[in-house]
Amino acid sequence: MYTIGWGKQQINIKAQGYAMFGYGQWSHRAHGEQTKLYARAVCIQDNQSNLSIICCLDMGCVTHAMRESACQQLHEQLGTVFNDSAFMLTATHTHSAPGGCSHEALYNMPTPGFVPKHLIAVTQAIVSSVMDAWQGLQPTDIHLGSDEFNADTPVAWNRSLAAYNRNPDVTQRTDQQRHLALDRRMNSLGFYRDGKLHALLSLFGVHATCIGNSLDKFDGDNKGYAAAQAESWLTTQGIDAPVAIFAQATAGDVSPHFHGKGALSRRNKIKGDAEYAYAQQNGNYQSDMALSMLSQPPQNIIKGKLDCILSYMNFSAMHVDAEFANGEQNAYTSDPCHGAAFFAGTPVDGLGTPAPIAKGMVLMAKTVKTWRLSGFNKNNPETTYYQRLYASQGPKNIVLEAGRKLILGRALDSPPSVFDPLIHEMNRQVKAGAIVDSPMVPSILPLQILIIGQLALLCCPGEFTTMAGQRLVNTIKPILQTRGIEQVLLCSYCNDYMGYVTTFEEYQEQAYEGGHTLYGQWTLAAFQTGFSHLAKQLIQPVELRVYDQNTRPEPVPAHELALRTNHGNVNTAVHTQ
């Protein structure tokens, strides 16, 4: 038996007209609150006083700034009992929550800019929820439940079927079978006292995009409604202050909206308040499933000690093990790049750039690539760099080189901004000198494994597609089985955010997810390489483990961050003199 506690704290951010994070739309601004947003935490301690902490936010993502700030305060509050390697911070990926919480430049651009009071509020909620959980530690049992949604439960659809069907290790699905082209299994940890369920942690992958970008209120979307529904039901059962965490698994290519013939027409019929109702229904499917499986006699009682490992790795130049790269001996990741498919968006969950402009981007990207690799540039010292970049990025039509801060081979402030306020804001920040040495997106990424008895949890940054996650689990499970691990689960959106992770085959399709897989076609292989190394260390006694414990993202230049810090102007983060 473990000693376990849980807590919940509201994220106190007032809607004041800033853009929300998720859709990347300048016009998607918050002017009200439909539901409250929360941080929910669980503290688990074993009989050797090892402490693991899981905290889930009703937010679009976790940023390094969030995690770093929370870790600093938790160290102060908990002292030596706090181990940042055993602290996992994740998010539900609702697209109707505040932005502006990152020190990197790109994902703050629509907000616009970095909003310190948002980061402070999120950090306060994290720390308060964790401290409530810590102070509530009591003897508690953990049961692992697992079940699949029936095929006729309209909870999720694959939104990138052509990419999914490229995988040789899947059952080929038709347009009418998109609801089967995903992992329909939910895994849930139930926390029991005196045989009664008091709290839970559910893992099921589906985008929190029931609510579109035309609404203007904060909302927890399907995962938030699932948590509220489960907590309400537990309260009716006499449980005091229950906590239900509905976190994400492989949500990358999974939509809560119908995909198939007539998908867009069907989506367009769900508008306004109907979107909130749709999100609530989707959440109810998830809460009903979790409560049903955890109300059954114990399927799998979790017992044993806690363990953990955390390491930050540079995904902009990572050599990939050949076994994960189709035998390729010289496979590398590269500087982060966004493709034309990223800017085009997804057809149902969130359209992006109009099709004619997206096609123009493709043409220009191909032209830039041809010129850079042509014989005319053979004496250019940059040629070697670009040969390696394009070898890594494969078929992606590169529009934004986030690493080198170029758009279609030109400076960031080169695109005309007269018709696009988002481009205008980027131009202003560039001209103000706010992004000279600051990263656009993260490249030093956290890989973490938590061990809870015979269960291992792979804590992954970003958004993994169904098969990318399945392959990662299949890679790590045989390694950890040698130390008695029976179940390996994956949680995504953990500890930082940098876009998507697709399989090599999915990447070749260059759908939205592949266009947003930043480090090239070997990105998944890099995760397999990195996680394999960490898993092998977990087999060793602690004193014999050899891995990088020191690398962390470099602090963003303070003077540049100040130049794009927003103190109340919803139109721009750049201060006018």
Go through the PLM ranges and name each one.
Residues 1-577:
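Non-catalytic substrate/cofactor recognition surfaces at enzyme active-site rims
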